[in-house]
Structure formats: structure tokens, C-alpha cells
């Protein structure tokens, strides 16, 4: 049984929604156990509520020590100036002990993201995230162009060969589109299929 973790940080629910569809795609693959978790919030609770952060997310909070228990980890983050969110960075900065042991070497790592605008740094967020995963010795998996949603030209949409993305809009009012969610499910399924092959 291959084990897949979908691990995310979401401020306003966009990445949370994408994570749920990533997990749905992974669960569609036979022989896969899927876990959905989030990283801890670093903003004090009163401040988080004051700025509208979604604090009532159902997914349990992950710990660094559990990461080696999975064959594949699909990470999700909103964009912060072309990079991952500080909450995800803080979590990953605690994985030095895992790096010392080589505990994540050979495991699949994949990334999805959310940006405020079409040109808000979705691709650089994912590719810069890859640097950390490569230092951990993980095997990077993106979204191949076999996923038809990547070539959808009928609308403004997220989605890259590096990983699924969604465009939240400058005010956060736009929710993930059907095309973006299709790409998310594809990514989850694709990673899960590869995890089964690697685990066998």
C-alpha cells in the first residue's frame, strides 16, 4: 500500500480547496492510502481572525517527524512574492534532522500553489519550492501535458507543467475553477500512480 500525504498551508481557503481535489485524485488510484494535513499557522489567532484568515479548516495539523512515513508528499502553498508562504517555509526549515538522516531520499515530492493574479508568481513559487525538495533527495513530479487542462485557451486559468495552480484574484474573491480543479485531481492521480510503482 503506497502512502500519499497532501500537505498544505491555506490562508483563505483556495489552497485548501485545491488540496481536497488533489487528495480526491490520489484516492482514485487503487492501492493508495491518502492523508490530508496542513502545516501550523504562525500568525497569532486574534490577528489571523482580524485579517480574515480561515482558521476553521478540518484537516489536522502535521508534524515534521511524520513525513518519512509517506511514499509521496504533495505540498500546497499560496504565493508570497514568488515564493512559498512563510508558514510552509517555517515548517520545512524544521526538517534538518530528516535531511541529516536522508529520511526523504527517493520519496516523491510534488507542489501546487495559489496566486492572486495570472502573473503573480505561480511558476516561480513551485520551482523555487523544488529546491528544498531536491536538497532532501526527493523525486520531483509535476503535471505532464497529457493533462488536457494545461492547454485550455478558452479562459484565464491556472495550471502549469510544474504543478496545479489557481488564481484567487487580487481580493481573493475568485474560487478555483472547474479546469483548475481538474488539473489538481490529475496531479493527485498522477503522483499516486507513480507512488504505487515506486513502492512495489
Swiss-Prot record:
Residues 4-191 form the Flavodoxin-like domain. Binds 1 FMN per monomer. Belongs to the WrbA family. NAD(+) binds at residue 12. Its cofactor is FMN. Keywords: Flavoprotein, FMN, NAD, NADP, Nucleotide-binding, Oxidoreductase. Substrate binds at residue 99. It catalyses: a quinone + NADH + H(+) = a quinol + NAD(+); a quinone + NADPH + H(+) = a quinol + NADP(+). Its EC number is 1.6.5.2. This is NAD(P)H dehydrogenase (quinone). The keyword Flavoprotein applies. GO terms for molecular function: flavin adenine dinucleotide binding; FMN binding; NAD binding; NADH:ubiquinone reductase (non-electrogenic) activity; NADP binding; NADPH dehydrogenase (quinone) activity. FMN binds at residues 10-15, 79-81, 114-120, 135. It is an enzyme of class 1 (oxidoreductase). PANTHER family: FLAVODOXIN-RELATED PROTEIN WRBA-RELATED (PTHR30546), FLAVOPROTEIN-LIKE PROTEIN YCP4-RELATED (PTHR30546:SF23). One of its GO terms (cellular component) is membrane. Pfam families: FMN_red.
